[in-house]
Amino acid sequence: MAPSFTARIQLFLLRALGFLIGLVGRAALVLGGPKFASKTPRPVTEPLLLLSGMQLAKLIRQRKVKCIDVVQAYINRIKDVNPMINGIVKYRFEEAMKEAHAVDQKLAEKQEDEATLENKWPFLGVPLTVKEAFQLQGMPNSSGLMNRRDAIAKTDATVVALLKGAGAIPLGITNCSELCMWYESSNKIYGRSNNPYDLQHIVGGSSGGEGCTLAAACSVIGVGSDIGGSIRMPAFFNGIFGHKPSPGVVPNKGQFPLAVGAQELFLCTGPMCRYAEDLAPMLKVMAGPGIKRLKLDTKVHLKDLKFYWMEHDGGSFLMSKVDQDLIMTQKKVVVHLETILGASVQHVKLKKMKYSFQLWIAMMSAKGHDGKEPVKFVDLLGDHGKHVSPLWELIKWCLGLSVYTIPSIGLALLEEKLRYSNEKYQKFKAVEESLRKELVDMLGDDGVFLYPSHPTVAPKHHVPLTRPFNFAYTGVFSALGLPVTQCPLGLNAKGLPLGIQVVAGPFNDHLTLAVAQYLEKTFGGWVCPGKF
């Protein structure tokens, strides 16, 4: 399946166009972008901001800390830092303070024991942020689409309602890429989010506002969604934890756009947080009845796990080469697991991984059980009503008149070219099924796979336009339908986060979550921005 000469020429032209657009974007950034005295926010000085969600909930239940003090500490941090990172795009501070006061009042009036409180409200009083694509009652729900700028959520998305029911207090909603289909979080309504480790770098997408908000200690737990890496890339670029659950476990209802048909299975809603110990409790709440499909209470003996690893995709001509920093960091993990933990570690070469992008496109090209074609992106741009001409929007964009971002215009222009014919779909569907079987057989119920999160650390703004296919390092596991936990592994020499994906077989999420906690203890986990 070597790429044809025509395919190589098309790729070259696409990258050349992306490079030119990137130059325009960088020039705009230099000439008219926001200026800050520092390239990172100030380090955290408030101790309450350095506690996990579980720790905060325990202190609040024990009445050792007032909920209103916790919420106020986060509001103060947001006011100080958010103007730099633009992670939270709409606050609900007044409502949050009222809800915090109600928690304190409830604890003062009712003398329920700690165990009862934990069982009823495991996240009692814990600050929460929510990706803007999810419905949070009374808040905007546009997904960065100008046509939906006046859309206000009348109800809560299912996962938001579950977390609120568990006691969490939403502070606001966070930025995303337009229609959640690009890996830089920027749109015409809210603007662009910036990486707290270096404001000139991206936060990832589409849950990028959530990633930078958590990394900058403006929140402690958050909600994201992932159909190609939209939880994992922001978690990686911002040095936090994120989990893409096994498909079908966590309800997706109440987000826009909501995947339908064959794609519905691949859209996964999941937790994002700074501390690994919050992942499993969040997942238990967010999954609702679906949690029965997982084994989160099963004790994991890490030494008995089988670890497999691969340092790159095998040489796809579409993707960038993996940075040496990331390869060396992965090897440090491998050496530690083998020599210190004493686990079984094996290097593997899965040859079909080099077709990662093609497998993701095949997933997005799949027809539903009713035979219907997938929803067209250009129809989403028009919010299923307004006709949108991608070519005309490109001309308008060049004149500074379009209400759409260039990645969205580009995708609308190219989607018919990208969408596979039935013959091509069947070819790559067979590859996907073969690779999935190979991985599932290899992993069994006691194996995990370590794989790069992305070929590079967080790139500078606009650079993704020149490397549009690099997301496939995460996208492939969406196509394969496997659970993945994104884990931070410190910072590189320039102060940007390093990390790794930990993959398991279907419904073995408990394995990747256990490995995440171990890696956090061993390699330090989240690093506060501004301390580098």
From Swiss-Prot:
The chain crosses the membrane at residues 11-31. It catalyses: N-(5Z,8Z,11Z,14Z-eicosatetraenoyl)-ethanolamine + H2O = ethanolamine + (5Z,8Z,11Z,14Z)-eicosatetraenoate; (9Z)-octadecenamide + H2O = (9Z)-octadecenoate + NH4(+); N-(9Z-octadecenoyl) ethanolamine + H2O = ethanolamine + (9Z)-octadecenoate; N-hexadecanoylethanolamine + H2O = ethanolamine + hexadecanoate. Gene3D superfamilies: Amidase signature (AS) domain. Optimum pH is around 9.0. It is found in: Membrane; Lipid droplet. Catalyzes the hydrolysis of endogenous amidated lipids like the sleep-inducing lipid oleamide ((9Z)-octadecenamide), the endocannabinoid anandamide (N-(5Z,8Z,11Z,14Z-eicosatetraenoyl)-ethanolamine), as well as other fatty amides, to their corresponding fatty acids, thereby regulating the signaling functions of these molecules. Hydrolyzes monounsaturated substrate anandamide preferentially as compared to polyunsaturated substrates. PANTHER family: FATTY-ACID AMIDE HYDROLASE, FATTY-ACID AMIDE HYDROLASE 2. This is Fatty-acid amide hydrolase 2. The lineage of its organism: Eukaryota, Metazoa, Chordata, Craniata, Vertebrata. The gene is FAAH2.
